[in-house]
Amino acid sequence: MRIALAQINNTVGDLEANAAKILDFARRGEQAGAEVIAFPELALTGYPPRDLVEKQSFLDRTAATLQAVADEAAGLRAALIVGYVACSPPNAAIRAQNAAAVISNGRISWSQAKMLLPNYDVFDEARYFQSAASQDLCELHGRKTAVT
């Protein structure tokens, strides 16, 4: 499996510009022969999004933009792994999760929230994100794969 790592320079909160960069680099990666293109943690939203994750409107816009990326990527053969902010399960103590989604064949085929949230030095993720309770494998081009 040929994997491309797309280290993009995104902007916190600028969902549309970040989505455009993701799609541009996805096309470039596929042209270079990649079967999977992996983007950074929180590539869609920018890192660190801090208090933006406390606004339901931001979470809703993020979900809509992630779906728009999936729709635009429908013509690609390569699968994309995109970091984004997801809504936590109902009744969670914190409303957002730091997550990764697999986009394949124009749809979001898998999503996983981060389990181990750093909370030291410059990291304050436990303040803003709900950790995942478990981790599942995804399938990339017929192969079971872990995304951490």
Regions found by a protein language model. Give the residues of each.
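Enzyme catalytic cores with a strong preference for nitrogen-chemistry domains
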Residues: M1-T148
